[in-house]
Amino acid sequence: MKRVTGVNSRRVLRQAVRVSLKPVYKMYERILEEKVKEGRVPEHVGIIMDGNRRFARELGLEPWEGHRYGADKLEDVLEWCLDLGVKAVTVYALSTENLNRPKEELKRLFDLMEERFKALAESERIHRRKVAVRAVGRLHLLPTRVRRAIKKAERATKEYKDRFLNVAVAYGGRQEIIDAVREIAHDVKVGRLDPDEIDEGTFRKYVYVGDLPDPELIIRTSGEERLSNFLLWYSAYSELYFVDVYWPEFRKIDLLRAIREFQKRERRFGR
């Protein structure tokens, strides 16, 4: 028999514990879901989908295979969010810094993005729930084939106005602010905008998802506890929740715990 050691042994033990506790978790999940539905659910949830590569590494897989597991998980999590009454979900799929990863990994990532955006355009789930799909970021940095797939998904869902899936790709929070400032500077220069009238409301018109409420809750998986340049303009008063599981292993009970914790917090907005 092959001996399992190190990281893999811990993973096997963790999986064994989860299997043995599955009936208990299911019961707890039902109770927790009832409590969550009794309280106020955030309208907009941001998710930093972290840990795909580490998940793959622990399974002895290639990094891109971890990203595929992560893409599968997104469909489930979106469905859970919508079932709970969340109106908008913004997920961090690819940062501007991620564009510096090895060429082979990026190629696989772009292949996956092209495939999944095309699938979103025709997804029964997306159209049944009437979810508008949008990509936000410096999209010009993506290959043409990926941009075409994005446009296909956006066109196919553009009539939907009540629920949103925003996918942040080639995205950086600082870069978004810089892009907004450049556009504002241009409009001031050509006389379209009076600089004395610029306020937060004005600025919102120039950021990527300024038409939506700020995310009330931001969840990050994998155990890392930082925003990593995600939604910087919007997150001034967001509640942050960090969970110590890799994104492909994120469960409905983890989402319920995050929202339940959100409901328990007192949001004072600096007052």
From Swiss-Prot:
Tell me the residue numbers annotated for binding substrate: 51-55, 67, 95-97, 101, 220, 226-228
Active site per UniProt: 50, 98
**Highest taxon above the source species:** Archaea
Q: Which UniProt keywords apply?
A: Magnesium, Metal-binding, Transferase
Question: Which cofactor does this sequence's record say it needs?
Answer: Mg(2+)
Q: Which residues of this UniProt protein bind Mg(2+)?
A: 50, 239
The subunit structure is: Homodimer.
Q: What does this protein do?
A: Catalyzes the sequential condensation of isopentenyl diphosphate (IPP) with geranylgeranyl diphosphate (GGPP) to yield (2Z,6Z,10Z,14Z,18Z,22Z,26Z,30E,34E,38E)-undecaprenyl diphosphate (tritrans,heptacis-UPP). It is probably the precursor of glycosyl carrier lipids.
Q: What is the designated name of this protein?
A: Tritrans,polycis-undecaprenyl-diphosphate synthase (geranylgeranyl-diphosphate specific)
Instruction: Provide the species name.
Output: Methanopyrus kandleri (strain AV19 / DSM 6324 / JCM 9639 / NBRC 100938)
Q: Which gene encodes it?
A: uppS
